[in-house]
Design a protein with these regions (language model features):
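Short glycine-/small-residue motifs
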Residues: 44, 150-151, 229
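A short beta-loop-alpha structural element at the N-terminal edge
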Residues: 90-107
Length: 237
């Protein structure tokens, strides 16, 4: 309780008006704690997908952008020959490679085209964290026609939110509307799954607003479904 109070005080000093988290619905002690401390069910859905044996279903991409709820991280060499359908699909669609600092301007441009807002500071912070925070970077950019056509920013969580098993969390995924029908989002997820398999990560999850039907539909077509985890929010005055 005291720690939560300290967190709320810090949040208020920094202009933050709500605290978000999530928990397994079977963790009754944690749910009881959230109930006693004023948390409510959030308006977001936590969805996930098994990496091993998962299936990326091909289809046209639209304006997709995941919410800003985590941070990003990690990097692999994709030079090895294609070993499965995910990798073949990813390479056939576009040139998908590790996110690099020089991609920042393109990421901010794509985000602005999708959201209609200037979130360059937020994107800069995510890219900076992706470059420095972890030895395992799984954030990717898709290049097509000489420019960045889309990106996915993800991290590997070990122990966050009370978990004991490692899981990959997608922070943000965005596709330039000019490449909406080029399968960029599918290619990004395909390569992400390849990389996670190499890291022996068995699940990937993300959080999506329940009103974002386009993004939910995209993830559901890619094999995602409802998670055992529920999103909670506490609004602070």
């Amino acid at each position: 309780m005291r720690l939560l109070g300290e967190l709320e005080g810090w949040a208020l000093k920094h202009g933050i008006r709500e605290i978000r988290t999530n928990a397994d619905w079977r963790n009754h002690r944690m749910l009881h704690f959230f109930d006693r401390t004023g948390f409510e069910l959030g308006r977001n859905h936590v969805i996930d997908c098994a990496v091993h044996g998962g299936q990326i279903i091909e289809g046209e991409d639209d304006k997709i952008f995941a919410p800003e709820h985590h941070r990003a991280t990690a990097e692999l060499d994709y030079g090895a020959p294609a070993a499965n359908d995910f990798e073949t699909l990813a390479r056939d669609r576009s040139d998908v490679r590790s996110l690099a600092p020089e991609d920042l301007a393109d990421l901010a441009r794509i985000d602005h085209r999708i959201t209609g807002r200037d979130r360059s500071e937020y994107i800069t912070r995510l890219v900076d964290e992706a470059m420095r925070d972890s030895a395992i970077r799984v954030s990717l950019a898709a290049h097509l026609g000489g420019s960045v056509a889309g990106f996915v920013m993800a991290k590997v969580d070990i122990g966050d939110f009370g978990r004991i098993e490692p899981v990959a969390v997608i922070d943000t995924i965005g596709v330039d509307p000019g490449f909406a029908a080029a399968g960029i989002g599918t290619a990004l997820l395909s390569q992400l799954f390849v990389n996670l398999e190499a890291l022996h990560i068995e699940r990937v999850e993300t959080v999506v607003s329940r009103e974002n039907f386009e993004l939910l539909g995209f993830f559901y077509r890619a094999g995602f479904g409802p998670s055992r985890r529920l999103a909670f929010v506490k609004r602070i005055a």
